[in-house]
């Protein structure tokens, strides 16, 4: 007796019109995550995962490439409007926002959510090179 063929169900992509782009720009890398309004991740990309290694990873161009890759990953969800949350002091802050704008998203607002301590932990000592 032959088994009936099992049909693999096609994964249905939900359509999202508004999204939130979380940009984490550290001194060493830039991480771009695009979520829906509830915070469910739709796609992400990093400068390191985009092929940049070492000191090239911490450049504005690497952050731009990461933003373009993240934008390509979430195009199939139908996102048109993006709210941008930027965290961190890194070099990829502005170039990431420009790349998302150039990718065809309408940026509704930009918020800086960098955590600022109320004199919390002691910072690391200064480097002596």
Curated annotation (Swiss-Prot):
The keyword Iron-sulfur does not apply. One of its GO terms (cellular component) is ribonucleoprotein complex. Coiled coil: none annotated. Keywords: Ribonucleoprotein, Ribosomal protein, RNA-binding, rRNA-binding. InterPro entries: Ribosomal_uS11, Ribosomal_uS11_bac-type, Ribosomal_uS11_CS, Ribosomal_uS11_sf. Disulfide bonds: none annotated. Pfam families: Ribosomal_S11. One of its GO terms (molecular function) is structural constituent of ribosome. GO terms for biological process: translation. Located on the platform of the 30S subunit, it bridges several disparate RNA helices of the 16S rRNA. Forms part of the Shine-Dalgarno cleft in the 70S ribosome. Part of the 30S ribosomal subunit. Interacts with proteins S7 and S18. Binds to IF-3. Belongs to the universal ribosomal protein uS11 family. This is Small ribosomal subunit protein uS11.
């Amino acid at each position: 007796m032959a088994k009936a063929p099992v049909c693999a169900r096609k994964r249905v992509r939900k359509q999202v019109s508004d999204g939130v782009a979380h940009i984490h720009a550290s001194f060493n890398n830039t991480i771009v995550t695009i979520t829906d309004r509830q915070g469910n991740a739709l796609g992400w990309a990093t400068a390191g995962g985009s092929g940049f290694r070492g000191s090239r990873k911490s450049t504005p161009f690497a952050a731009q490439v990461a933003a373009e890759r993240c934008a390509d990953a979430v195009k199939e969800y139908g996102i048109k409007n993006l709210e941008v949350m930027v965290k961190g002091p890194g070099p990829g802050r502005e170039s990431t926002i420009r790349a998302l704008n150039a990718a065809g998203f309408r940026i509704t607002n930009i918020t800086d959510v960098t955590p600022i301590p109320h004199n919390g932990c002691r910072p690391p000592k200064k480097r002596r090179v």
